Regions:
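Membrane-interface anchor segments at the N-terminal boundary of transmembrane helices
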Residues: 33, 326, 333-400
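Transmembrane-helix motifs of polytopic, lipid-linked glycan transferases
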Residues: 114-135, 172, 176, 381-385
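Membrane-interface transmembrane helices that cradle and orient dolichyl/undecaprenyl
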Residues: 27, 138, 173-189, 217-224
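Membrane-proximal stem/loop segments at transmembrane-domain junctions that anchor or position
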Residues: 260-344
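Conserved alpha-helical positions within TPR/SEL1-like repeat arrays
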Residues: 478-488, 512-522, 546-556, 580-590, ...
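Transmembrane-helix signature of polytopic, membrane-embedded enzymes
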Residues: 3, 40, 122-149, 167-168, ...
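Short helix- or helix-capping micro-motifs
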Residues: 43-46, 143-151, 175, 196, ...
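Membrane-proximal lumenal/periplasmic loop motifs of glycosylation machinery
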Residues: 54-68, 76-113, 326
């Protein structure tokens, strides 16, 4: 062999090390920067228009459910609490993402949402690249535009919620899998493992992709030596370990247990697999007779059942065992439930979580217009046609098919929300792009037979995805209830009542909405209406401690202190962590003259709600009544430190200071009280 030939052979071997050949076909058409920019800008303009419009919805700044939890968590991170407490219950990536943004930009929810829609628009451009690499430039363009105009994607991208990271990380991982940059295999596979690990810290069920990618490493590189495949697998696993093990160590050090992600497997599995389950989250309320089975609630109920304190891992194991017991006892019922959940995953309706897609459609012109046709039902039909028309290439596409099936199964095994299936969307968009382009080609070529088969597949898929099992494609009771809470925080009580009433009209047995109506009517002084809805809430959710406490408050304020105290005590027995129940009990005891007995529940209320001024104020009032002036003054001062605009505390402190002859200070607090009460 000549020296020149030897150099060429060495170069070829080196290139192969840097550029592993895969069974996924390389693009037949070069992707171009202009199309990247066009798709990105189209997606961005649509999402920006949507963002401007939804600022009018009360939920934009008054977050609900997980969004509020993530935001509060992020604020603690931005304030310096980087490690937190206990084993993670919810996946941590998005709260830390938010926390870093809030550390840099402050608590600016509009700007954060804008940055998120930039990521969403980038993901549309990435889908174009992936589609061009897998199929053709035309298919890539179609796939990118499908995602750009897909109404639920526009909705999810602008929420304070982790779906945006699910989308972006999955698209980036697919790009690395396809090796656009011809990266050295060490960098590539460590990157793939790291991105999948990050995706698992946002959407835990995505870790089901780990064995699929590992399998593909071994069977998808047919032209590479067997010896090189373990090295690739090792790099992939190293990337996973690099991301997940530090989280596990953090959980071990802070929470006492080594968990690679979170400790919510058991409760989540039970929510989706129990005798009352119907495939959605809300069904578990019928079983536990409470509002939710989350974090502290899951722990409290498990500890009550076991009779001792439990670690997060033990709590998860308890609920997992409860679900498995149900499956063993009623296997036929569980299989029917599993089939129902599988169909719900593919149903056209976006099953609502804290934020209801269909309520946002009422505020957003892009969602209103695009929602008529650019929804999951259309996407699934287009993707089914694309899968059929691309089936001849199944050997090089099997990983993508397997990812779709695995992600869908990982949702169905638990329970279904629209956002839980969102990671399916970019994968389906790829095949939707193929379906559009190939169907157009067949039409131009007048290839009627394959077009007829494609039409049959479209119709069959449409029947399945539009089967009436997920409810109407309209706002749900939970969405209206959360809207009512947001209106209430804005001080718009009438609008809040109207929204909560709509929730009850949609779902008369929705106890949470009855509870909120009770609170709203009590706020307006409409006692009989409040009594009626509190009663209905407690009939539906007798173990709801907050409802017991607030109904007791209504009774106590109406003069029936004895009945009120019974409800306060029941609330505490159900959930001793409800500070309001302790506060209400302490106030009621004080009103009956049982001052000494009132101190303990008021102190407990202050301990449970350290940011609340009311428990400290009432303690000060009791100390003052007992002539313990020093303790009373300290309590009133502390209450005002917590809440400077608390007029009753200013007035009580003024009276106390006057009794002690401190007339100048008393006058200042008296004047401040008058100013605040005007």
């Amino acid at each position: 062999m000549s020296k020149r030939s030897a150099r060429l052979a060495d170069k070829t071997r080196a290139d192969r090390r840097r550029e592993p050949s895969t069974t996924l076909d390389r693009s037949r058409n070069k992707t171009t920067t202009p199309w990247l920019a066009v798709i990105f800008l189209i997606a961005l303009l649509i999402r920006l228009f949507h963002l401007v419009q939804i600022e009018a919805i009360p939920l934009f700044y008054h977050l609900a459910g997980d969004g509020r939890t993530y935001d509060e968590w992020a604020q603690r991170i931005a304030a310096g609490d980087w490690l937190g407490t206990g084993v993670f219950y919810q996946t941590p990536l998005y709260p830390y993402f938010l926390g870093v943004l809030q550390l840099i930009f402050g608590h600016n929810l509009w700007l954060i949402r804008f940055l998120q829609i930039l990521l969403g628009s980038l993901s549309c451009a990435l889908i174009y690249l992936i589609g061009a690499q897998l199929f053709s430039r035309a298919a890539g363009i179609a796939a990118g535009l499908v995602l750009a105009f897909y109404a639920p994607a526009i909705f999810f991208d602008a929420l304070i919620e982790k779906s945006i990271l699910d989308l972006t990380l999955l698209c980036l991982m697919l790009c690395l899998l396809l090796d656009f940059g011809r990266a050295p295999y060490v960098v590539k596979w460590i990157g793939v493992g790291s991105l999948l690990g990050l995706l698992g810290l946002s959407r835990e069920n995505a870790l089901i992709l780990v064995p699929l990618v590992a399998l593909w490493i071994f069977v998808g590189f047919s032209r590479e030596s067997l010896a090189s495949r373990p090295r690739r697998l090792g790099c992939f696993l190293a990337g996973l370990i690099f991301v997940l093990v530090p989280v596990g160590l953090r959980n071990l050090v802070i929470g006492g247990e080594f968990k690679l992600t979170t400790a919510q497997l058991g409760p989540n599995f039970f929510i989706g697999n129990n005798p009352a389950a119907d495939g959605t989250y809300g069904s578990v309320r019928h079983l536990i007779k409470e509002v939710q089975l989350e974090g502290s609630d899951a722990k409290r109920l498990a500890e009550r059942a076991i009779g001792r304190q439990l670690t997060p891992g033990e709590v998860s194991s308890y609920w997992l065992s409860q679900a498995i017991d149900y499956i063993k006892a009623q296997p036929a019922d569980w299989l029917r439930l599993l089939g129902r959940k599988w169909l719900l995953v593919w149903n056209a309706r976006e099953i609502e979580d804290s934020d209801d897609y269909y309520i946002y459609r009422q505020f957003s012109a892009p969602l209103t217009i695009l929602g008529w046709f650019a929804h999951f039902g259309t996407l699934a039909c287009l993707a089914a046609v694309g899968i059929y028309l691309a089936w001849r290439d199944w050997r090089r596409l099997w990983l993508v098919y397997a990812m779709i099936l695995a992600l869908a199964a990982s949702v169905a095994i638990f329970y279904v929300f629209g956002r839980y299936r969102y990671p399916l969307v970019p994968l389906l968009a790829l095949f939707a792009g193929v379906g559009i382009v190939e169907a157009g080609r067949l039409f131009r070529e007048k290839a009627w037979r394959p077009l007829f088969k494609a039409a049959i597949i479209w119709v069959s898929t449409a029947v399945i995805v539009h089967w009436p099992m997920g409810g109407d494609a309209a706002p749900g009771a939970a969405g209206y209830n959360n809207l009512a809470n947001a209106y209430s925080k804005q001080g718009k009580v009438d609008a809040a009542i109207k929204a909560a009433q709509r929730a009850v009209e949609i779902q008369p047995d929705y106890g949470v909405a009855h509870y909120n109506l009770g609170n709203l009517y009590m706020q307006q002084g409409r006692v009989e209406m409040a009594r009626r809805h509190f009663g209905e809430a407690l009939r539906l959710l007798p173990n709801y401690a907050e409802a017991q406490s607030n109904y007791g408050q209504l009774l106590a304020e109406g003069g029936d202190l004895a009945a009120g105290m019974e409800h306060f005590k029941k609330a505490i027995a159900l959930n001793a962590s409800v500070g309001r129940a302790h506060l209400n009990l302490g106030v009621a005891l004080a009103r009956t003259g049982r001052m000494d007995e009132a101190i303990a529940p008021l102190r407990q209320a202050a301990l449970l709600s350290p940011e609340a001024a009311e428990p400290i104020y009432y303690l000060g009032s009791i100390y003052a009544a007992q002539n313990h002036y020093a303790e009373a003054e300290a309590a009133f001062v502390q209450a005002l430190r917590l809440r400077p605009d608390f007029a009753p505390a200013h007035q009580s402190l003024a009276q106390l200071l006057a009794l002690q002859g401190k007339k100048e200070q008393a006058a200042q607090h008296h004047q401040e009280a008058l100013r605040l009460m005007r």
